[in-house]
Structures are given as structure tokens and as C-alpha cells.
């Protein structure tokens, strides 16, 4: 149900295009930092020339999606997609095609305003404290993303002290994802930053695996109707439109990427010493949170000749890093910060994301 669809032109004019909308697509991805989408318009007023639409407009959009159980129609209803207070940003006009004598069909691609602000701002300052708090500071800072959207955070277990050297805001947040450990899920280092229609999320893959099922998808006949001949929107929403089979496992590639095992060699500049950290996929598997029934993707049985599993070869992937002793610093009785935290994040995170 389309409740509101209004274009705000660069000149400040509001144009209601609800009656012209043919299709609206919204895309969410836990590996994408912002929501994106497109809207297909059947235009009888030639808005591209008359408004004009130039790819810099704002889009107010409010949609109500089908629900599993009835709810009160209010602002907190999870079935409502609301971009009225925080309009979307139109950034591209796709090919304009004629339809009949007086209509044009074209699509407008859009994303959230945070994606636009990320392109025009850079972070150059130092931060210290909880990574989750630093993410929120970057999100709310008027010089950076200046976001008013909700931010859902999974608490982090470590403290960091970092300098962001002229990076785009999302790049700074991505770095925080790479050095953070979860406080709730076995210090999992699998943090992601992404956006849904409900807000932004800074949480680990392990935390996502603990969530309840939100919707069960089934295969239905597309655009099926009920007894009254009406299209059942809820069934169409739950319908599986396409199924594809992922490529078969590539063992050599996975070994070279550090999926099964790896070695991190750390050079301590202060003590002039080297220390190795070996990652073993089979030994670490139980520390991660998995979906129901998950089991290791490699055999636990040792090779008959070498008496080793694929996880017993840490030299297949080598990482090198430098560090310095905390004795160089003084802050109270204990130095609580970690510069990069790589020994607790890099290898386990690398393997987790490959899974």
C-alpha cells in the first residue's frame, strides 16, 4: 500500500507522483551500508523536462507492507516503511522510453541521504572509547553523516584509541567493524554496519544468528488471488521468486584466503620481538554462533599420509603486523585501549566472513 510518494525538486517544489508509480523496489543487504532502490514511473506529464528532474531531488516515501499478524497503524509499526521525515536521495535517471503517444516510462534510482553525505565529507580527528560509541558519534556529527535515523547497536567488549586520517565516514566505520569484539557473543569479531528501512545497524554476524525468524519464504504461484479475485499481497511478499545454486567449494582458494587456517606474525617495536598467532578453523568453530544444524564445512578426519586436517596448516595464509608496548603510555593505573586489536579480530573475522 503506497501511502505517500512525493518528489522534492531542487527548486523546492513538491510533486505528488503516487498516481504515476508503476513499481517500487527497495534493496537491503547486510554487506551494504545503505538502503537503495528504484521507482518506475509511467509519466504523462513529462516531469523530466517540466519539473525538471535532474537526478538531485529528494523523495518522500511511505509504504505499508503486508503483515503476518494485525497491528495498530502507528509510527512504530514494523510493517511501515517511512522516509517522510528523512527523505531519500534521487541520484540517477535511467533510460526514458516512450509508451504510447503521450506517456514516458523511466526509473529513478535512489538511496538514503547518508550515502550522499558520505561522498562529500571526510573524517580527520582522533577518537577513544567504546567502538559502538564512536560509530554513533560519526553518525550524528553534523560535519559528517548528520544522521537522525535510528541506530541499533550490539555492545562491544573492547576499548580503542584511533586517529582517522582524512577518511570518508563509512570507511572509518568499516575500520571499527574490523577491530571490534562483541560483548554478548563470545567476543565475536564479525561486526557489520548496514542499513535497513528501520535504521542503521552495527552488530555482529553471530548476533544476527541468534535472532528469531522474521518471515518464512515459500514457493507460490506469482500474483495468486483469493476467493474474491484480489491479489494476496502477503503471499506475494513471502513468495520465492528465484533460486540459484552457489558455486561448489573451492578448497585451494579457501586455503589461500585464510578460511581454514592462518598465521599472524606481530613485530613488537618496543621489545624487539616477534610473536605468532595461529588460527585453526575446527578449534574455533564452536566459539562462533551459527544457525541451527550448522557444522564445519571441512572434514575433521586427518589425512592418512600427513595425519593433518586442512586446518592444521597455518602457513597457507600469512599476516604481518607491528605493535608497540603499552609501557610507552601512561593513563591511570592501566592502559585500557587497543590500537588495532588484530590478534583478536583479523584471523577469526577473515574466516567468519568466508563462511
Task: Please report, for each region that a protein language model flagged, where it lies by residue.
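Short secondary-structure capping/junction motifs at helix and strand boundaries
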Residues: 70-72, 80-82, 145-150, 185-190
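Glycine-centered loop/turn motifs
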Residues: 54-62, 217-218, 225, 355
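Assembly/oligomerization scaffold segments
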Residues: 1-120
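Short beta-strand-centered interaction patches in the first periplasmic/extracellular domains
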Residues: 105-108, 114, 151-252, 256-258
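Glycine-rich, acidic and aromatic/proline-enriched surface loops and short helix-turn segments
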Residues: 101-117, 128-151
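Second-shell loop/turn segments in exported
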Residues: 48, 119-128, 158-164
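An acidic/polar, Gly/Ser/Thr-rich interaction patch typically located in mid-to-C-terminal regions
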Residues: 25-52, 223-355
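Short, intrinsically disordered, mixed-charge
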Residues: 55, 140, 178-182
Amino acid at each position: 500500500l503506497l501511502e505517500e510518494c512525493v518528489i522534492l525538486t531542487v527548486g523546492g517544489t513538491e510533486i505528488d507522483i503516487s498516481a504515476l508509480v508503476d513499481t517500487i523496489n527497495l534493496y537491503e543487504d547486510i554487506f551494504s551500508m545503505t538502503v537503495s532502490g528504484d521507482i518506475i514511473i509511467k509519466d504523462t506529464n513529462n516531469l523530466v523536462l517540466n519539473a525538471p528532474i535532474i537526478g538531485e531531488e529528494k523523495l518522500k516515501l511511505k509504504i505499508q507492507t503486508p503483515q503476518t499478524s494485525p497491528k495498530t497503524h502507528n509510527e512504530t509499526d514494523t510493517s511501515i516503511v517511512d522516509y517522510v521525515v528523512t527523505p531519500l536521495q534521487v541520484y540517477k535517471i535511467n533510460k526514458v522510453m516512450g509508451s504510447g503517444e503521450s506517456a514516458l516510462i523511466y526509473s529513478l534510482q535512489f538511496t538514503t541521504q547518508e550515502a550522499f553525505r558520505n561522498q562529500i565529507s571526510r573524517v580527520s580527528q582522533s577518537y577513544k572509547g567504546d567502538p559502538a560509541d564512536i560509530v554513533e558519534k560519526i553518525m550524528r556529527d553534523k560535519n559528517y553523516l548528520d544522521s537522525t535515523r535510528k541506530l541499533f547497536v550490539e555492545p562491544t567488549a573492547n576499548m580503542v584509541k584511533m586517529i582517522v586520517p582524512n577518511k570518508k565516514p563509512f570507511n572509518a566505520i568499516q575500520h571499527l567493524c574490523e577491530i571490534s569484539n562483541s560483548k554478548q557473543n563470545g567476543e565475536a569479531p564479525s561486526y557489520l554496519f548496514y542499513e535497513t528501512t528501520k535504521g542503521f545497524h552495527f552488530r555482529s554476524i553471530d548476533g544476527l544468528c541468534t535472532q528469531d525468524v522474521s518471515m518464512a519464504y515459500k514457493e507460490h504461484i506469482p500474483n495468486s488471488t483469493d476467493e474474491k479475485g484480489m491479489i494476496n499481497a502477503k503471499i506475494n511478499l513471502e513468495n520465492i521468486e528465484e533460486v540459484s545454486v552457489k558455486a561448489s567449494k573451492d578448497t585451494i582458494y579457501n586455503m589461500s584466503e585464510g578460511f581454514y587456517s592462518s598465521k599472524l606474525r606481530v613485530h613488537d617495536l618496543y621489545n624487539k620481538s616477534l610473536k605468532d598467532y595461529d588460527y585453526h578453523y575446527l578449534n574455533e568453530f564452536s566459539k562462533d554462533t551459527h544457525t541451527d544444524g550448522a557444522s564445519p564445512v571441512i572434514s575433521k578426519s586427518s589425512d592418512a599420509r600427513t595425519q593433518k586436517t586442512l586446518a592444521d596448516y597455518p602457513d597457507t595464509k600469512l599476516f604481518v603486523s607491528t605493535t608497540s608496548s603499552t609501557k610507552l603510555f601512561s593513563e591511570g593505573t592501566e592502559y585500557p585501549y587497543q590500537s588495532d586489536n588484530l590478534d583478536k579480530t583479523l584471523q577469526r573475522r577473515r574466516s567468519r566472513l568466508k563462511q
